[in-house]
Amino acid sequence: MAKIPTDNHIRSMLDSVHPSHLQSSFDQVVAALREKGGMNEFQRLGGRALIALDGTEYFCSYKLGCPHCLTRKRSNGKTEFYHSMLAATIVAPGHNMAVPLMPEFIAKQDGAEKQDCERNAAKRWLTTHCERVKALRPVYLGVSGILCKRLP
């Protein structure tokens, strides 16, 4: 390979791809694991899958921002631009691997006055993906307390 694209170039190419187009890739991984018995290693509590839901930031800058960025004011008075997501992952105690599921991005929502948050992303994830993972008989783990209160 003569020219290797930079991470910024790859990001700019992928920015136009809606995340929903990636859903089938996540589904195919889980389906292949189930078909070949790979999910058996992740079953706990009588054959249930543990799905951890936790927020994480994957971009942060004082200089670069986009229309989808969330913002926060720091104590130094500067505005910080960032992107975050709710990661959903099949996990098992004592297992050194995890199976990622489709994330839910924490971003400005159309018509909303307040910024999006991890708790709202968890509600959206559960609404969107509950049926999809139902066969795994999931137990949801709210890593940072997002499931401490009952979600509708």
Functional labels for PLM-detected ranges:
Residues T6, G47-F59, A88, A122, ...:
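Short, conserved catalytic/metal-binding motifs centered on acidic residues
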